[in-house]
């Protein structure tokens, strides 16, 4: 009996213990233990703290970049820079050292002579240093000196920057031929050359296909000279190459496409109003004969559209 009771108790306890074991085996990431996750979290936190501390580190700026010194009483305060001090030191001769003779009296005499020499030499040295410092630190006079240097340089004559714009001789002019793809070609011609000569010289065999446009005018007359068209040196002439079968001479060729487009636009515009009138008439016919299919809002909308269209038509054709 006792053994059976123990077996029953063990069987009743086994599910609870199995659930506890399952809960203890649960991890945050499958295949990785909780201890590893804790260690990784501690390492990540440590790295974040180290990076935060490094981000607040500021390097000490050198004290040798800008030094300000105050001159003793009686002298003007001057801001000394490193390179200014070097220039001043180069300009002033270094004092030579004199050997000190032995003896107290000689030392006293030398001290008095040195003090007297320094007293007389300091004003001269300051007088030599102050003009050089004032010249170097004169910020307001810097633009004037630069302007003086710029004016002393000889100015290059106009037209020398670009060698292509210069004409080879006084009797020749440079003409820039610009195409639709923004490419340019430099043509050298004489003022008495004609448009036909320019075409045959630079577009041989394509004279009938090339169209030259200058200041919005189409150069159609091949017998006109460049001087008569006010084409001077470095002028720009726009060039257009038409397809071989589309070259039609005369002003009628240029007017035909525009007239066709305008007539097409007039026809479409004139047809819009009759078509809309017919549509409104059909809708009103169905409204009168089949009024059971039209609700109140639909009827009100139809009346509003009709009134708006009538006002628009009277406004267009009543002028």
Swiss-Prot record:
What biological-process terms (Gene Ontology) are attached?
ERAD pathway
InterPro entries, per the entry: TMUB1/2 (IPR040352), Ubiquitin-like_dom (IPR000626), Ubiquitin-like_domsf (IPR029071)
Q: Name one GO cellular component term.
A: membrane
> One Pfam family for this entry, by name?
ubiquitin
Q: How does it sit in the membrane?
A: Multi-pass membrane protein
TM annotation in the entry: 36-56, 264-284, 298-318
Q: Which Gene3D superfamilies match?
A: Phosphatidylinositol 3-kinase Catalytic Subunit, Chain A, domain 1
- Stretches assigned to the Ubiquitin-like domain: 173-246
Q: Where in the cell is it found?
A: Membrane
UniProt-annotated stretches for the region Disordered: 88-128, 145-165
State the UniProt keywords alphabetically: Membrane, Transmembrane, Transmembrane helix
Mind telling me what this protein is named? Transmembrane and ubiquitin-like domain-containing protein 2
Q: Which gene encodes it?
A: Tmub2
